[in-house]
Amino acid sequence: MIGLVVSSADTASVTISDQLHELVEWESHRDAAGDEYEQYDDFEMRTIDEWHLEAENASELFSTTPQIIAFLSRHSGDTGPLLTTHFTGNFGPAEYGGEPGSFAQACPMIQQTLLEAFDRYAPSKYDVGIECTHHGPTTVGAPSLFVELGSSKAEWNDPDGAHAVAQAILELSGEDAPANVETDRTVVGFGGGHYAPRFERIIRETDWVVGHIGADWALDSMGAPAANRDIINHAVTASDADVALVADDRPELTKVISQADIRVVQERWLRETTGVSRPMVSALENALVPIASGLRLGTPATEYDPATSDEFVITDRHTDNDAVGTVHTKDSTDIDTGTNHNVDAERTESEDSHNIRDAIDRADADAVVLAFPTSLMETISGIDIETTNQVFSEHTLAFETTEGGTRPTGRMIVSDYLSVESITHALIDILKLKYDRVERTDETLRVRRQVFDPAKAATLDVPEGPAFGRLAAGESVTVAGRTIDPEAVHTTETVTFPVFSTSSSSSSSSSSSSSSSSSSS
């Protein structure tokens, strides 16, 4: 049951109630104490005389304890027409109801649903948003939030604005309603302004929901984090969160939160993990590096459903971790990942067998950690960094990056050899943009191109300067009455990169090649 609390002292609350009665038919009842209340579907509406922020133990008003309680309220401020919602509590003193340093239980999924519904129903002159945690009540007896119409007398009496709020409230009911949905994707927020734009952005643009938010002014009223650990912990538990986002540079607060075994993340972490199960995120971060250190998650990672598998095992012979599970990697000496971050670009054949098809087939794991050589990645990224990122995002579970997440290092996690093949073919296409000829053997990519050779030009008495530039650009020049063609001063540059074999044997026989015509001298 969803409990609705109307305050007869609050004009906006009464206006919203009127619109709820316009939208649906409510049945009137009286409880054992003789108090009147109304019911519709999963809703029960109670009217009180006092202001909402004084309505402690509101769950006791209802015939049964509600799953959630929504306080239908006005919003006051200089914000213009606004539909908003927020949770209640006090990080500092209790100046407007409730107890100091105390919080009502939040219902983040409900807030997300209301925000989305506000977007659909709000009249054009109204803005839509959320607020930080503030005022009472702090002892409600059920998860709760304020649903507000504002921000002046004109809006409090506006049937159109109230109608939008009423429509949004009615969307909280039903079998698939948020009150019936559990989530492990709740973040508690610290820092920022009263209207919490960063946290609203997280709700709108990721699959994470947000619990209590301690705005800058609220944290300042709380005092030193180290002296108020209980308050911080209460905000976390009242949000049912195990992840926190600190919006500003607050090292002491971050330290206190971390010491309570609450993971402090960046907005990038919330965006990167959107659509990826928490067990999968943990497994990928444990196998490579944390997202904060440059890990990026690929589209295939969103396809893993922890409900259909007890564990997801990642194998990497280069790790010392021998644990197996959804949040661990598995060490296996049977796998040769070919990981080498210092491969010489000029070597002509790989030193080890990189037979990935056999390796993955032999692995007692769901995925393996592999790496393309650094030299190849530097070359590829230098040609087309945007396509390189797209390729790794489309075909890996996760991949490491540098330079603020913009350049893949080549170290990655894949679940099948076809993914490696797809990446390799895509990298060949990128190499073709720079090189005249690209040949693939079973374990190498050999690229060739014609490049200007200053030493050859010097032997033909070509002076440095514009003539060098014209020859390098493929134009002929005349020196001392003699025509020198560009072919005479170009040489064939050959670079060989080791790659992974996907054949059934480890031989180095030619498996495929891709080339265009080239000249050499």
Curated annotation (Swiss-Prot):
Cofactor: binding details: Binds 2 Zn(2+) ions per subunit.
GO biological process terms held by the UniProt record: D-amino acid catabolic process
Catalytic reactions on record: a D-aminoacyl-tRNA + H2O = a tRNA + a D-alpha-amino acid + H(+); glycyl-tRNA(Ala) + H2O = tRNA(Ala) + glycine + H(+)
Disordered: annotated segments: 323-353, 499-521
Keyword presence, Metal-binding: yes
Keywords associated with the record: Hydrolase, Metal-binding, Zinc
GO molecular-function terms, A-Z: D-aminoacyl-tRNA deacylase activity; zinc ion binding
Class of the enzyme per the UniProt entry, highest EC level: hydrolase
Basic and acidic residues composition-biased segments: 343-353
KW Endoplasmic reticulum (keyword) present: no
Superkingdom, natural source: Archaea
Cofactor list: Zn(2+)
A Pfam entry, by short name: tRNA_deacylase
Biased composition regions of type Low complexity, renumbered to the chain: 501-521
EC number: 3.1.1.96
Function: D-aminoacyl-tRNA deacylase with broad substrate specificity. By recycling D-aminoacyl-tRNA to D-amino acids and free tRNA molecules, this enzyme counteracts the toxicity associated with the formation of D-aminoacyl-tRNA entities in vivo.
Alphabetized HAMAP family for the sequence: Deacylase_DtdA
PANTHER family reported for this sequence: D-AMINOACYL-TRNA DEACYLASE
Subunit and partners: Monomer.
Family statement drawn from the similarity comment of this UniProt entry: Belongs to the DtdA deacylase family.
Record's protein name: D-aminoacyl-tRNA deacylase
Annotated organism of origin: Haloquadratum walsbyi (strain DSM 16790 / HBSQ001)
